[in-house]
Amino acid sequence: MTCGFQKLFSVEEDFEDEDFLSALENAENHVVSALPRDAGCLRPVSSRPQETVQTQSSRPVPSYPTSNQSVPRLCLPPSSMRENAKAPLSTGVMSLRPASISSSSLSSQQRMTGAKVFQESSGPQPSAAHSGYIFESHQQGIGDFEAPDQDDLDKALASMEFEGAGLELEADSGATQILPAKHCEDPVLAKKARVADLSGSLRKEPMVHCRNPWPSLRPTSATGSLPVPATSCVSTSQQRGSPAPAPQYLPVAGRTIRSSPQNYGPGQPLQSPRAWSSGKPRFSGPQRPHGSSAAFCQGPLSSRAPVSSVESPVSTPRNTSTPVTQPALQTPVVTNHLVQLVTATNRTPQQPSRPSIRAKTRRFPGPAGLLPHQHSGENLEEIMVSTPQTPTHGALAKFQTEIATSSQGSVEEDFGQGPWLTMKSALGLDEGDPTCFLYTYSIVMVLRKAALKQLPRNKVPNMAVMIKSLTRSTMDASVVFKDPTGEMLGTVHRVLLETHQSELRPGSVLLLKQIGVFSPSLRNHYLNVTPNNLVHIYSLDSGDGDFLEPPQPLPKDLGNSHGSLQPDVAAEPTRGLRTAQNPAVAFPEEELSEADDLDGLLSELPEDFFCEPSS
């Protein structure tokens, strides 16, 4: 018999029904001869018409995804329970093993006896003297369930077939049950059993072939042989008290049954054999409420073996009276790539960090909106005086840096000696004195006051400037004036050019009074020097010995007293003395009146005169 089954399971292909049935008949003959005389074959009692099977066969069966699932063990009850078969069996794959005589001492959390599984009422446990099966599950806390009718069980449990299904069986190493001596060679080995038909008495009954949605069984190498009950759906048709028929054992060549991870029901994945090697099933998914006692086969699935029979689910799962305890979920296998994907998905998209560039806000439209804010209580004059800078008149609005750097050293040369020092010593002036006109009416102050329109009648009372450059034209000369504070453009009347041609050259210092300031715009301001404005000229050729008389200090009112002024002293000493005594001789009345007419003077100037001179 062992050789016959080895021939069947030598390859993983399916065989014809004739080869399979012949092997089963050979196995039955050996098993029946080895069993006691009073043991009978398991046969269902048909008490309901055939329509039940046909009705159930017409129900659609869902296909389930593949997964791993724990497999609790199944032991048949030791007594006949025809009328009390009301409790549903677990839809998970059960391992069948015979119960020992001391089955009454089994733990209620580890085993569900026949009375607990198949009886709706809490009846006493049948006698343990009968040899049978006990439903045993590693899942604890399973309560009583409502079982289907007896007729459904009779029709459904008539004949079962393991087709295209995989089963993972494990013998519990810590169980207290004792296998028969001839079947206890290796408790860890599992068998692959496929039932196409039962004994001749079962063939007379209506055949119900249930295609099992369990994973397909694949034989592998094993070290021993262990006959395992091949029926997964057992019908207990004997009455209470009658001797229970001994189950038929199908001795199969010892092989470890390996199942592919195919799910047979939603929420109940099968586990790989590694999970069963420890003897404790792990549940990787929530358990479904158990169906009827014959709900091992949930529905017909495609089979590789050509069998012709009614394919229908044995029974439909019913609502249980007690919910099944949800086992702990198994930790899923997480890879680094999966963690990165999940992290990237859950991560909130962030904008790339950019350096915050604060835009300059304008207080009002236009370029003036960017000017710094003027604090209250500060005058524009005080701000400008505190920060001296190059004047922004028309020709020198853009003052070159190289000129500014060179002018720092030239200030000491130009104003620390020569005509400028001579003027200060002759008049006794100190440009550091705030009351002195050298400070109050310096070039930078004149430019600022002209921009603020603070000059009375656009004229400067007293002023001392040095000629930096002079450009002669057909009518008047364009001059650049400077002092220690800055520079300013201006014009010199042609009369002065004719009379003081030799004195008016770069480096000469002019002492002026009542000079008119022409302001064509707020940024452009010009000095208009006429013969009436000139008080004295300090040229480079003049020295201390050139003066016949020491210079007299200037009176407080320079505008009214002209007798103390000494123009042209450096150029012509003799004439300087005469003009100092009588200035009216040098400047006639009619000539002075014409020089005061600024409008006529400005109208005579050409347009290109106000442009920047070519350097």
From Swiss-Prot:
Descriptive protein name: Homologous recombination OB-fold protein
One GO BP: DNA synthesis involved in DNA repair
Molecular-function GO terms, alphabetical: single-stranded DNA binding
Listed GO CC annotations: nucleus; site of DNA damage
Knockout-associated phenotype: Deficient female and male mice exhibit infertility associated with impaired ovarian development and arrested male meiosis.
Biased composition (Polar residues): 47-71, 232-241, 257-275
Function: DNA-binding protein involved in homologous recombination that acts by recruiting the MCM8-MCM9 helicase complex to sites of DNA damage to promote DNA repair synthesis.
UniProt key word Nucleus: yes
Pfam families according to UniProt: HROB
Start-end of Low complexity biased regions: 302-317
Subunit details: Interacts with MCM8; this interaction is necessary for MCM8-MCM9 helicase complex recruitment to DNA damage sites. Interacts with RPA1; this interaction associates HROB with the RPA complex.
Naturally occurring in which organism (per UniProt): Mus musculus
Subcellular location: Nucleus; Chromosome
